[in-house]
Amino acid sequence: MGRFVVWPSELDSRLSRKYGRIVPRSIAVESPRVEEIVRAAEELKFKVIRVEEDKLNPRLSGIDEELRTFGMIVLESPYGKSKSLKLIAQKIREFRRRSA
C-alpha cells in the first residue's frame, strides 16, 4: 500500500499543472474541499491517516488568494498517487451530481 499526501490543489480544475494540478482538467473538480476528499477516500476504502486543514501547498504561495485552497490529507491506498487522485476526483463529481 502506498502512502502519500493529497493537496486539494491537485484536483482543482481552476489551476494549471504548473500550480500543482495532477489530474486531467476533464476529470478535475472546481474548488475541492478537504471534507469532500476525505469522504471520497473513505468511500473508496482508502485509509485516511492524517488531515490538516490549515496547510497550504507550497506551489500555491505565489498565486492569487482566491485560487489558494488550504488543506492536506495523508492517505494510504493500494494504487499509485495518480490513479488514486483520479478515483477521488471521479467520486467527488459523483457526490456533486447526486446533491445537485
Swiss-Prot record:
Any idea which UniProt keywords this protein has?
Answer: Cytoplasm, Ribonucleoprotein, RNA-binding, Signal recognition particle
Keyword RNA-binding listed? The answer is: yes
What GO terms describe the biological role, i.e. biological process, of this protein? SRP-dependent cotranslational protein targeting to membrane
Please give the coiled-coil regions recorded for this protein: none
Q: Which GO terms describe its cellular component?
A: signal recognition particle
Q: Where in the cell is it found?
A: Cytoplasm
Please report a single Pfam family linked to this protein.
SRP19
Q: List the disulfide bonds.
A: none
The main place the protein resides is cytoplasm
User: Which SUPFAM superfamilies does the protein's record reference?
Assistant: SRP19
Name the InterPro entries for this protein: Signal_recog_particle_SRP19 (IPR002778), SRP19-like_sf (IPR036521), SRP19_arc-type (IPR022938)
* GO MF terms, alphabetically ordered: 7S RNA binding
The keyword Phosphoprotein appears for this protein: no
What biological function has been recorded for the protein in this entry?
Involved in targeting and insertion of nascent membrane proteins into the cytoplasmic membrane. Binds directly to 7S RNA and mediates binding of the 54 kDa subunit of the SRP.
* Similarity field: Belongs to the SRP19 family.
Q: How does it assemble?
A: Part of the signal recognition particle protein translocation system, which is composed of SRP and FtsY. Archaeal SRP consists of a 7S RNA molecule of 300 nucleotides and two protein subunits: SRP54 and SRP19.
Q: What is this protein called?
A: Signal recognition particle 19 kDa protein
Could you tell me which species this protein originates from?
A: Pyrococcus furiosus (strain ATCC 43587 / DSM 3638 / JCM 8422 / Vc1)
Gene field: srp19
